[in-house]
């Protein structure tokens, strides 16, 4: 049973990868040449946000029972954000309890872009940053811009 699940996961991952590289997108992706279960992605910081101009690297690791379990998305580029911690973990419901097999990597990446545009300070992974976002948006934006300039200018 495990091998059958593993094969189905690999087929789905390969299909999603082919679909994503065959069209223009808001992000670029790559695949570990030795492991189909490991991808990289680069997201450009959305215009009009403190992340504008930044290039953010992420790793994507798929479980062997994908798509029944979500892949793990991790920011490798440090980012100042209430829903992303120092280890690069992302607090997003579609990566946890709202995950369904119908979701695909492209949809998650688009959701991450939206999270950069509209952080959710009411469900922060980093409470101090969430509080700053709510109480002093100017200072939050300034810190996020400085962090982006320091870490995300590839």
From Swiss-Prot:
User: Reaction catalysed?
Assistant: S-ubiquitinyl-[E1 ubiquitin-activating enzyme]-L-cysteine + [E2 ubiquitin-conjugating enzyme]-L-cysteine = [E1 ubiquitin-activating enzyme]-L-cysteine + S-ubiquitinyl-[E2 ubiquitin-conjugating enzyme]-L-cysteine
Q: Which InterPro entries does the entry mention?
A: UBQ-conjugat_E2_core, UBQ-conjugating_enzyme/RWD
| Record keyword ATP-binding present | yes
Naming one, the record's GO cellular component terms include: plant-type vacuole
In terms of superkingdom, the source organism counts as Eukaryota
Pfam families for this protein: UQ_con (PF00179)
Give the EC number(s) under which this enzyme is classified: 2.3.2.23
**Annotated catalytic residues:** 91
Query: What UniProt keywords apply to this chain's record, in alphabetical order?
Result: ATP-binding, Nucleotide-binding, Transferase, Ubl conjugation pathway
Which Gene Ontology BP terms does the record give? protein ubiquitination
Q: Pathway membership of this protein?
A: Protein modification; protein ubiquitination
Q: Which residues form the signal peptide?
A: none
> Per the database entry, which stretches of residues form a coiled coil?
none
Identify the residues that the record assigns to the UBC core domain, covering every copy: 8-153
By sequence similarity, the record places it as follows: Belongs to the ubiquitin-conjugating enzyme family.
- Cross-referenced PANTHER family, in alphabetical order? UBIQUITIN-CONJUGATING ENZYME E2
| Name used for this protein in its record | Probable ubiquitin-conjugating enzyme E2 31
Q: Which organism is it from?
A: Arabidopsis thaliana
